[in-house]
């Protein structure tokens, strides 16, 4: 069997924050095969011969997945939840079945499979690759799936790691941490319908090997997340398992086990008295009456573009509206630095920046694959980043708790070598190997090529929500944001998502008025001599700087020549200022910050900064620094995703996933606590806004 999980019921409800990876021991079984054994629980992960067949027998056949998945209707999402990801073999078996069914059932082209799994002791990448390598040979149909899984396997930090396998319409959410905490975090925001689990894979060892697995808290969470047609399957027929399921409303049944095993257990949550009734009698079709056919996104910055792409990827027709051209605002900088704001490891479970950064990196690497096919510029240049503020933000001793693939400290010698700096003291540093530079223009171009997305330049002046739809009115505008015609344009749509940064409040006053923070970037074209002495990779200090090469599409947004080296530095920070005029004094501030932190560059940077190029944009931020993501109060069709601050390219992808899930009635990749922090209706924001109005 695949893997045990454990829960410590004596501890508090606080989630486990520091992940202890599985201790894999390789032992020889009775047949002379080398098999992986759990060092924590002293039992084998799987047998070399029959475990794939056993997985299919227990979890696929006895949850009746071949029939249930084949009977899905277009746009329907089927959700599986597994306790104990282990080596991923149950996922791979399910994925292969899903792929096979989609080939033979064309109506599944727009259906989705959502596989949620928990793991307290995840298998390290090197061990997982070694464990799965024989299965790629033994079961060739799994080989391409194993390759994709390993390519996306996340760093082992607590929280939810969303992996989207887009060509297969498969979403995998790996929740790392104690299973009971992870299940408690699965709290879908009730909008049009409450999400629920269709089938459970109760995957664990016998009660004698893992006594803390089958607890009342686990069974109560299973009940909370299920509904009348939910099924479950497990290897275990222990009395505690049967009693636990029965106490939560499941009807249980013993079935023939796999191979020599005499029996296994199946269950269904239903008023029916037995499992003998065929699955066709169970309600397998979630209500789709509220599933939107079309949605309008207002705002063509990074928040709007990622929201549009995420919804379009779910089969929804999306129209993106903006009074200006796409990326005309703060999202249109020459490059965006994708690097996390680090936090001590015990905070990471609820840390949006960490999970958002990792998901963004996976998504942008997928976009890179698409860009390569189209022979267009890459979206993410994975350069790595050296953070020189580590002592201020987190402390080098706390970096040791993170996987090296996410964040690490490097020797002073290596730091000097990769940065190109010679004189600065780099003894305290934070190296972020997966970080890099996002090309906003390339990202915009790729997203707007999606067949389900259209863009229209339109200045929206009114939004009216009715019971059946939303009606928007506005005026077409030209490139200078001037009304091209006084004839009103009306658009009717199922839903609207407002992603208009600080102007979102003007479109709907239920969205709080946010802080406006002006930021100006500077860049110049260095000579070959200067380039050889400038930093070789992005650096974070009291500002940030980065070298890059101009791409073919850059000139559409900024004064950048193709194939020419550029050096970017910034950015100014002017609170309460929404003016985007270029200011020479802010170029000077950017210069001064860099020289103050790295004096050796004073002889490298040009003395005359009047020739530098600049761009000013307005960051939008709430008073508690959390974005606004969700359905507006007293509304069924109006949403917002805004107030990303300076981290739009790291936060927008994961927030767009959460918003799409809320809109469609699915489980989000964010915990219930995090969703509450992001709600546009959270009490603290509106209390402060009302207090401010009274003081005026």
Swiss-Prot record:
The GO terms this record gives for MF are: flavin adenine dinucleotide binding; oxidoreductase activity, acting on the CH-NH group of donors; tRNA (5-methylaminomethyl-2-thiouridylate)(34)-methyltransferase activity
| UniProt keyword annotation of S-adenosyl-L-methionine present | yes
Query: Required co-factor?
Result: FAD
Q: What is its EC number?
A: 2.1.1.61, 1.5.-.-
Any one annotated GO CC term: cytoplasm
Q: Does the keyword Transmembrane apply?
A: no
* Location of the region described as tRNA (mnm(5)s(2)U34)-methyltransferase in the Swiss-Prot/TrEMBL record: 1-270
Please list where the region (FAD-dependent cmnm(5)s(2)U34 oxidoreductase) is annotated.
Answer: 298-696
Where in the cell does this protein reside?
A: Cytoplasm
Q: Keywords on this record?
A: Cytoplasm, FAD, Flavoprotein, Methyltransferase, Multifunctional enzyme, Oxidoreductase, S-adenosyl-L-methionine, Transferase, tRNA processing
Recorded catalytic reaction(s): these are: 5-aminomethyl-2-thiouridine(34) in tRNA + S-adenosyl-L-methionine = 5-methylaminomethyl-2-thiouridine(34) in tRNA + S-adenosyl-L-homocysteine + H(+)
| GO terms for biological process, alphabetical | methylation; tRNA wobble base modification
Q: Which domain of life is it from?
A: Bacteria
Any idea what job this protein has? Catalyzes the last two steps in the biosynthesis of 5-methylaminomethyl-2-thiouridine (mnm(5)s(2)U) at the wobble position (U34) in tRNA. Catalyzes the FAD-dependent demodification of cmnm(5)s(2)U34 to nm(5)s(2)U34, followed by the transfer of a methyl group from S-adenosyl-L-methionine to nm(5)s(2)U34, to form mnm(5)s(2)U34.
In the record, the note on similarity to other proteins reads: In the N-terminal section; belongs to the methyltransferase superfamily. tRNA (mnm(5)s(2)U34)-methyltransferase family. In the C-terminal section; belongs to the DAO family.
Please give the HAMAP family that the UniProt record associates with this protein.
MnmC (MF_01102)
Instruction: Name the chain's protein.
Output: tRNA 5-methylaminomethyl-2-thiouridine biosynthesis bifunctional protein MnmC
Give the source species. Answer: Psychrobacter arcticus (strain DSM 17307 / VKM B-2377 / 273-4)
């Amino acid at each position: 069997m695949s893997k045990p999980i454990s829960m410590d019921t004596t501890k508090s409800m606080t989630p486990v924050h520091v992940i202890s990876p599985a201790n894999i021991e390789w032992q020889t079984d009775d047949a002379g095969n080398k098999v992986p054994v759990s060092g924590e629980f002293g039992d084998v992960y799987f047998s070399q011969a029959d475990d794939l067949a056993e997985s299919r027998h227990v979890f696929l056949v006895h949850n009746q997945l071949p029939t249930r998945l084949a009977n899905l209707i277009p746009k329907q999402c089927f959700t599986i939840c597994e306790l104990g990801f282990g080596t991923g073999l149950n996922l791979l078996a399910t994925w292969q079945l899903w792929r096979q069914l989609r080939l033979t059932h064309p109506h599944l082209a727009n259906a989705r499979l959502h596989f949620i799994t928990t793991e307290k002791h995840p298998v390290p990448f090197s061990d997982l690759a070694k464990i799965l390598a024989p299965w790629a040979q033994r079961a060739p149909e799994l080989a391409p799936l194993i390759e994709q899984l390993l390519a996306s396997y996340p760093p082992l930090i607590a929280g939810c790691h969303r992996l989207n396998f887009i060509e297969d319409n498969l979403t995998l959410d790996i929740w790392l941490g104690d299973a009971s905490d992870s299940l408690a975090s699965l709290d879908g925001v009730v909008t049009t319908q409450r999400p629920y689990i269709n089938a459970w894979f109760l995957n664990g060892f016998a009660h004698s090997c893992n006594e803390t697995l089958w607890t009342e808290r686990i069974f109560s969470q299973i009940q909370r997340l299920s509904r009348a047609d939910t099924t479950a399957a497990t290897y275990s027929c222990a009395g505690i398992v049967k009693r636990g399921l029965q106490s939560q409303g499941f009807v249980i049944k013993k079935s023939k086990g796999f191979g020599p095993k005499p029996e296994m257990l199946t269950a269904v949550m239903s008023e029916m008295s037995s499992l003998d009734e065929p699955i066709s009698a169970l309600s397998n079709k979630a209500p789709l009456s509220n599933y939107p056919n079309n949605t309008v996104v207002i705002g063509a910055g990074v928040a709007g573009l990622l929201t549009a792409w995420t919804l379009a990827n779910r089969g929804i027709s999306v129209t993106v509206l903006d009074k200006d051209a796409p990326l005309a605002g703060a999202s249109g900088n020459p490059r965006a630095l994708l690097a996390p704001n680090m936090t001590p490891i015990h905070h990471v479970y609820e840390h949006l920046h960490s999970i958002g950064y990792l998901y963004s990196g996976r998504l942008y690497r997928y976009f890179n694959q698409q860009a390569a096919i189209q022979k267009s510029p890459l979206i993410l240049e994975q350069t790595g980043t050296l953070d020189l503020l580590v002592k201020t933000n987190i402390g080098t001793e706390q970096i040791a708790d993170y996987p090296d693939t996410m964040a690490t400290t490097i020797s002073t010698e290596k730091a000097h070598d990769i940065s190109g700096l010679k004189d600065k003291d780099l003894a305290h540093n934070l190296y972020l190997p997966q970080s890099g530079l996002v090309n906003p223009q390339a990202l915009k171009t790729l997203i707007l090529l999606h067949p389900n997305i259209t863009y229209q330049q339109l200045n929206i002046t009114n939004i009216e929500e009715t019971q059946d739809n939303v009606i928007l009115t506005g005026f077409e505008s030209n490139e200078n944001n001037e009304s091209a015609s006084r004839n009103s344009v009306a658009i009717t749509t199922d839903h609207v998502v407002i992603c208009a940064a600080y102007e979102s409040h003007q479109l709907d006053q239920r969205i709080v008025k946010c802080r406006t923070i002006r930021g100006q970037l500077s860049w110049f074209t260095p000579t070959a001599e200067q380039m050889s002495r400038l930093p070789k990779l992005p650096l974070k200090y009291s500002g940030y700087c980065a070298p890059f090469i101009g791409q073919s599409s850059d000139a559409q947004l900024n004064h950048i020549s193709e194939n020419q080296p550029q050096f970017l530095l910034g950015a100014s920070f002017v609170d309460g200022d929404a003016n985007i005029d270029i200011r020479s004094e802010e170029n000077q501030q950017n210069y001064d910050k860099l020289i103050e932190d790295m004096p050796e560059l004073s002889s490298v940077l040009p003395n005359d900064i009047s020739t530098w190029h600049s761009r000013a944009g307005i960051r939008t931020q709430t008073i508690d620094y959390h974005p606004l993501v969700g359905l507006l109060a007293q509304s069924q069709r109006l949403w917002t995703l805004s107030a990303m601050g300076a981290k739009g390219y790291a936060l927008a992808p994961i927030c767009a996933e959460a918003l799409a899930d809320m809109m469609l009635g699915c489980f989000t990749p964010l915990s219930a606590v995090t969703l509450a922090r992001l709600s546009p209706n959270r009490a603290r924001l509106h209390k402060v806004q009302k207090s401010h109005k009274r003081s005026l």
